[in-house]
Amino acid sequence: MNTDLALLRLLQLASPGLPVGGFTYSQGLEWAVEAGWVRSVAGFAAWQREQLHDTLGYLDWPVLARLYRACQADDAEVFAYWSRFLLANRETSELRLEETQRGSALARLLDGWQLGQDPAWRNGLELSQLGGMAWLGAHWAIPLRDLALGHGFAWLEGAVMAGVKLVPFGQQAAQTLLRDLGEELPAVLDHALVLDDEQLGGGLPLLAIASSRHETQYTRLFRS
């Protein structure tokens, strides 16, 4: 696949129009706002920066790299292992449900294209959105670094749009957050791509608490 087409496929995977329900989740932010943990643009930036450096840097991106390489090597067993590892590191039932819902949605998209139909791959694809992104990234010859940055920006954009509704703040602040937090993505990715297996795993106690409390939050806009 030529580089122009690979770029277009990456934009498709990173698009908010990808039918995986990206903007229906806040990943605990909704309860953090209600609890008073996040009250301002600065508070939101600090909340997301923690997740960027911990969850993205030590879990999502390193796992994405391993999933991608498993796809390149046509190793469904390794792919399934890291898919299960990712799901096991989602610390609440709500976050695990979000992961499998996103994964199933992307797997259904692959079904429509008659891709990833081998049961050895299909079962792993249903476990996480990262699995589907890795599979399509390898299939479409999207370079790993580009794929990871596209995924990271899509994650950040979804979080900022949730913040617009919840904190709240305006579009100027939203774009400034995307600009400023986005500048940190390449350095975090550099570190994520050189981690050894035993260094992987995310753990943010406040995020886990917020997600747990959100499960029973009386009035809410988001599914997580």
Curated annotation (Swiss-Prot):
Subunit structure, as described in the record: UreD, UreF and UreG form a complex that acts as a GTP-hydrolysis-dependent molecular chaperone, activating the urease apoprotein by helping to assemble the nickel containing metallocenter of UreC. The UreE protein probably delivers the nickel.
Keyword field contains Cell cycle: no
Similarity comment: Belongs to the UreF family.
Localization (cell): Cytoplasm
Function, in words: Required for maturation of urease via the functional incorporation of the urease nickel metallocenter.
Naturally occurring in which organism (per UniProt): Pseudomonas entomophila (strain L48)
Protein name stated in the entry: Urease accessory protein UreF
InterPro entries: UreF (IPR002639), UreF_sf (IPR038277)
Keyword set, alphabetical order: Chaperone, Cytoplasm, Nickel insertion
Principal subcellular localization: cytoplasm
Pfam families assigned: UreF
GO cellular component, one term: cytoplasm
Top-rank lineage group of the source organism: Bacteria
GO molecular function: nickel cation binding
